[in-house]
Amino acid sequence: MSPLSAVPAVRRAAVLGSPIAHSLSPVLHAAAYQVLGLRWSYSAIECDEAQLPGVLMSLDESFVGLSLTMPLKRAILPLLDDVSELAVAVGAANTVVFDGLGPFLRRRGENTDVPGIVAAITARRPDGVRNAVILGAGGTAAAALAALRELGVDGTVVVVRDQARAGELRRCADRLGVTPTLVDWPGRAALGEADVIISTVPAGATDQLATQSPAAHGQLFFDVLYDPWPTAFAVASLAAGAAVIGGLELLVQQAARQVELWTGRPAPIEEMRAAGEAAMASRSESS
């Protein structure tokens, strides 16, 4: 590539994961780049952990960055040249920024899930959060724990389905300098006392809680899922008078920060959200 054409005219980005065909990320990013007047493309690439090193090496210089789903958020870390302090603390990078070209290229890992969660909660709880419950102990739970630390939450209870599988979350808590209380599923007593309940568990995992311990008036329920949506717990919580945030809002907020990292420009969040809502409505009509 000659010096006169060192920067490709059309830039590219992609989301990696398996399965990935369901992802709404391409819809959100396409909306953002259209509003910003950029000739950028954003695609979904099927990729599992074993394929990740090969896919990473195959990307040409038109790529500005990547979005990653679990478990790739953790698997990518040893393949990067630089990792932000936040991504190191959380133990996951959902975003890769490509800095430089050719022999000067460096791949930098960032975590935009954490500021995405912070933004989503702050919009609904501008006066702050006293205490919170996280359902689940996986990678997204670690991001939620970091977000709650940034929000100044002193007491966080993590409800886990298997204490033996919560080791990585405990290590994350140590890196963050926080001491959450881990309790066994379903943690109904903790649910009833929380200002905010964040669910990071798979679809269907909270269905039984929907009939027994939904969020109530004065509480905020935040589910990271957007497909399927709404979940039974979200429906029951709304009926009980709770405020509810769906996973689309997290997807929009974390994607907006990816756009800003890659372009250096403010992301058009409203247009991204509208595109995501339209895509979800279309899926609902066709299902």
Segments the model singles out, each with a brief description of its role:
Residues 224-287:
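Adenosine-phosphate binding glycine-rich loop
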